[in-house]
């Protein structure tokens, strides 16, 4: 669970245990890199990530790594393909659910658990317009025009990261 808060299982064929361990170390390092880039909760020294974009919502464009730009461009395509059902701009709503879940996990008893109100969710939903995610591929920047908007790249980030990590592993000779 040290990357993307999920289990990663790899089945690979190598000539030796040493080669396998070397390949797995490289693959794990790649996953850690993508996890840090797509993280919405944590800062990392020297890393501009999705949290950095969220922290600058409504303030300024953020210069980002190509791996963030490519993933966000895929997310926009997925938004179009799914008629808006897959929306990385839903972060303000998902953040409310996250906060309530965290509070429930910390609660002494289930009696202390609460659900968000419809008013909270509806207010947050006003800040989920993907058109307010301004990507400038030439400048390599991302700007959230709505200061209350938050990105949550969730499934798109994980899926894209796994695809890129697998391509890199294959290029290193892993089968």
Residue map of PLM features:
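Residue-level recognition of oxygen-bearing side chains
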Residues: 161
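A contiguous, well-ordered beta/alpha segment that forms the leading edge of an enzyme domain
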Residues: 1-154, 164-167
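Short, well-structured beta-strand/strand-turn elements
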Residues: 167-175
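Short, conserved phosphate/pyrophosphate- and ester-handling motifs at nucleotide-, phospho-/glycolipid
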Residues: 158
């Amino acid at each position: 669970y040290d990357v993307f808060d999920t289990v990663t299982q790899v089945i690979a064929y190598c000539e030796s245990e040493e080669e396998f361990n070397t390949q797995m170390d490289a693959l794990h390092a790649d996953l850690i890199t993508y996890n840090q880039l797509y993280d919405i909760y944590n800062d990392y020294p020297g890393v501009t990530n999705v949290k950095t974009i969220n922290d600058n919502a409504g303030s300024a464009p953020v210069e980002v790594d190509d791996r963030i730009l490519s993933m966000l461009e895929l997310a926009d395509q997925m938004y179009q393909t799914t008629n808006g059902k897959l929306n990385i701009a839903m972060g303000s709503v998902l953040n409310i659910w996250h906060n309530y879940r965290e509070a429930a996990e910390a609660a002494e008893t289930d009696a202390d658990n609460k659900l968000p109100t419809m008013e909270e969710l509806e207010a947050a939903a006003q800040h989920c317009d993907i058109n307010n995610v301004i990507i400038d591929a030439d400048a390599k920047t991302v700007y959230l025009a709505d200061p209350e908007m938050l990105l949550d790249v969730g499934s798109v980030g994980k899926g894209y990261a796994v695809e890129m990590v697998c391509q890199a592993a294959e290029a290193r000779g892993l089968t």
